[in-house]
Amino acid sequence: LMKSEPYEFSIDDLASRKNQTTYWEGIRNYQARNFMRDKMNIGDKIFFYHSRAKPLAIVGTMEVASEPYPDPSQFDPTSKYFDEKATEEKPRWFLVDVKLIKKFERPVTRDQIKEEESLQEMMLIKKGARLSIQPVAPHEWEKIHEMAGEPLPD
């Protein structure tokens, strides 16, 4: 699961990109970075979650479209994601490209997830679990699709 604030970058923004693909920049939390750098592989499926929105919701699915690579914004002094300690030789921050699979016609809200008995262990609803990138268990992936009325992507 990857979170984005829709006023910064929404699922509609992703849909409007060339090939419905973009890079997922700006991760500046080590645990989230490690998920992206060490656990994500090309073809892995991802939920797109709108955070700081009304309602908070899983709004669709994407897939990883590249191997992890250094986030170029860390080297750009004009970027809000600039990191003066990062160097080309020793980058600190990584990203992957993501490609839209499907925008849900019926997003699944955080409140709906909290009410679903089988999703009580989902990191998204755990107190203090604010990471912008989070793992999702296979049964959670399947249940969210069921709740959205969507078939599982290939």
List PLM regions with ranges.
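Aromatic- and Lys/Arg-enriched surface recognition patch
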Residues: 60-131
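Short, charged beta-turn/beta-strand-edge "cap" motif at the junction between a beta-strand
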Residues: 49-56
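Hydrophobic beta-strand signal
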Residues: 47-48, 63
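Compositionally biased, charged N-terminal/linker segments
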Residues: 1-42, 140, 151-154
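A cross-family signal for N-terminal binding/gating loops and helix N-caps
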Residues: 1-11, 57-60, 77, 81
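A generic structural signal for short beta-strands and their flanking turns/coil linkers
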Residues: 20-23, 42-44, 58-60, 92-96
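Charged phosphate-binding loop/patch that engages nucleotide di/tri-phosphates or the phosphate backbone
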Residues: 132-154
